[in-house]
Amino acid sequence: MEPGSQQQPSAPGQQPPPVGHQIVHVRTDSETDLETLFNAVMNPKNANVPQTLPMRMRKLPDSFFKQPEPKSHSRHVDQTTTWQDPRKAMLSQINITAPTSPPVQQNIMTPTAMNQQRLSQSAPVKSPPALQPQSPPSGVLGSGGNQQMRLQQLQMEKERLRLKHQELLRQVRPQELALRSQIPPMEQDSGPPNPVCSSGISQELRTMTMNSSDPFLNSGTYHSRDESTDSGLSMSSYSVPRTPDDFLNSVDEMDTGEAITQSTIPTQQNRFPDYLETLPGTNVDLGTLEGEAMNVEGEELMPSLQEALSSDILNDMETVLAATKLDKESFLTWL
């Protein structure tokens, strides 16, 4: 059933639908019936809307048309009963407060009110005298006066909060400037310390490092090794090429005419701590770089370099080169 639609004639055995309602039976031509229903709902002007009945013709109780009894009045003194629409009072309050709001705002912004607010903020004890003008007059009891007083209180509270906010900003601003002035020295004092240089690095090298114009040199505590894209070295600690152990063993076994024992090499390697192997970039056989054996061999070779090469040394070198050509596939690693 749809309200506001046209009424169709009903069957003889059925009750007629209520006034303003329509019963649609979808039997054969559903499209036509649905279109009729749609037009009736979308165009209610063409529908038969019942007219409003007067109060005397409506089905109302008899007590509605009689005067109330004396005990049923809302005011027992004068025996009267009245009812007023509450919306009228709201509209009257709005109409009263609308023209009076600009003078209130203008009065609040006067220098006298500003001085009173400043005195109330500086001396809280004097706040009751400053708020005395806000109290409503004794003769004003209407709703318009209460609304105006409430609006004035809200405006004064808003102005007081604004002044308090400005005062807080003025107090915080010097502290903020003082903190900002202290931040650069703190950053300079808390800068990263210079790395501890070893005894082998000279003072000139440290001066060049500290006074360098390159911004990347002084950016951190120490330099970090970056990955290279063209040298074939990665960031891992095993990227540095090493001499195979088989090659060193074969060289030690050669007959070079000097009594070099096998125990000298491990003693040189054991002089360095084991934790150096775990550091990145230190996976190098440090025993071959420097040592007592290197110094001894250098001292022994210095006087012999001025002498002519003997045939025994040449024969030994040919033997070594021949052995190297035969076994180079087993111990040489080409990079």
Curated annotation (Swiss-Prot):
Q: What residue spans carry the region label Transactivation domain?
A: 137-335
Composition-biased stretches (Polar residues): 114-124
Q: Does the keyword Flavoprotein apply?
A: no
Localized where? Cytoplasm; Nucleus; Cell junction, Tight junction; Cell membrane
* Keywords, sorted A to Z: Activator, Cell junction, Cell membrane, Coiled coil, Cytoplasm, Membrane, Nucleus, Phosphoprotein, Repeat, Repressor, Tight junction, Transcription, Transcription regulation
Pro residues composition bias: residue spans: 126-136
PTM field: Phosphorylated by lats1 and lats2; leading to cytoplasmic translocation and inactivation.
Q: Which residues carry this modification: Phosphoserine?
A: 30
**What are the protein's GO molecular function terms?**
transcription coactivator activity; transcription corepressor activity
**Which terms does the UniProt entry file under GO BP?**
hippo signaling; positive regulation of transcription by RNA polymerase II
Q: Where is the composition biased (Low complexity)?
A: 1-13
GO cellular component annotations, sorted alphabetically? bicellular tight junction; cell-cell junction; cytoplasm; nucleus; plasma membrane
Q: What does this protein do?
A: Transcriptional regulator which can act both as a coactivator and a corepressor and is the critical downstream regulatory target in the Hippo signaling pathway that plays a pivotal role in organ size control and tumor suppression by restricting proliferation and promoting apoptosis. Plays a key role in tissue tension and 3D tissue shape by regulating cortical actomyosin network formation.
Q: What is this protein called?
A: Transcriptional coactivator YAP1-B
Q: Which organism is it from?
A: Xenopus laevis
